[in-house]
Every structure is written in C-alpha cells, then in structure tokens.
Amino acid sequence: MKKLAKKLLCLTAVLALTLSLFTGCKSKNEKTLFEYAGQEVTFQEAHVYARIMQYQAEAQYGAYFGDSMWSMQVGTDSKGKKITMQQSVKDSVINQLKQIKVLAAHADDYNVKLTKSEKKQIKESVTAFAKDSTGKKVMKKTEADKDMIQKLYEESTIASKVMQAIIKKANVTVTDDE
C-alpha cells in the first residue's frame, strides 16, 4: 500500500509539472518583444517587418555588395561608433513599429476607422502579398499567416490615416521664404 501511495504521489507530481509546462506559455512569435507607450509589439510583428526590409535591401543592394552588405558601415552614431546595415535595418524596424503603434493607438482620438473600401483593398493586398515570392518567403520565415499579415496592413493603414488627420488638424503651411 505504501509503494502504491508513493507511485501515485510521484505520478501526480510528474503530471502537475508536465501540465505546468503547457499552460500559460506563449510561442516565440506571440511573445512581447517590447512595449512602447503602452503598446505591445510581438516578436512576430517585428520579424515580419525586418524580413520585408531585409529582402528589399538584398534585392536593391545585394548585387553590388553581396553578403558583406550587412556588415558594411552605413553611418555612425552620436558617440562615433559605426552603424552597420544590419543595425540600421533593426533600428528602422523598431522606429517604424513604434510610430505605427502610437499612431494607431490614437485612432479614436481622430475618429479614424477603416472604410469598407479600405478593408477590401487590404484584403486584396494581403492576397497579393501571400502569392508574391517575397511575401511567401516572409510568411515562411516568420510563420505568419494571412490573418497576421492583414492585421499589420490594417494597423499600418490606420496609422497612416491618423498621421494625415494630425497634419490636417495642425494646418501646417510652408511659405516660399521657408
């Protein structure tokens, strides 16, 4: 009887530990990479943007610079430290995501919503992206599905509309003297 009790206790402990491994865990793609102004950015969101920028840069500059383009110096920071193409792309992705998240978070403040026409256009763009060779590579590498890509398109479109609303509200005019 004592042996049976020990085995049951052991089995219960093993089951409890096993279940704890599977509950409350997020996949790498769902994990929050960073938070900015109260807005979460997941690893997958950043990964999608980074891959798009990577493939665009490789298509544009790869023939000229080859694989060494990512370690090539493209500038210096305020401390005089060299900035590589790779670091520049990473920084651009982070800054772009920060801007999109903050602007999209203010959509209600400017009464910005997607129209039916915009939603239709986004759906068509997502379908085209998923069929495009670059889009296929991005989706495969990042494990993003069409829903994820659509979410990014929608958020980016909303951010753009908020930016337009801010500019319109500011009523900025530039004279010839400036």
What does each model-identified segment do?
Residues C10, V14-T18:
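Hydrophobic alpha-helical transmembrane signal-anchor segments
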Residues T18, I100-A104, A159:
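Alpha-helical transmembrane segments of polytopic integral membrane proteins
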Residues S20-G24:
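C-terminal motif of bacterial Sec signal peptides marking the signal peptidase cleavage site
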Residues D147-Q150, K161-E178:
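Acidic/polar surface patches and capping/hinge elements
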Residues K2-L11:
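Bacterial N-terminal signal peptides that target proteins for export
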Residues E155-S156:
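Acidic, Ser/Thr/Gly/Pro-rich low-complexity segments that form flexible
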Residues S27-K151:
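N-terminal targeting/tethering segments
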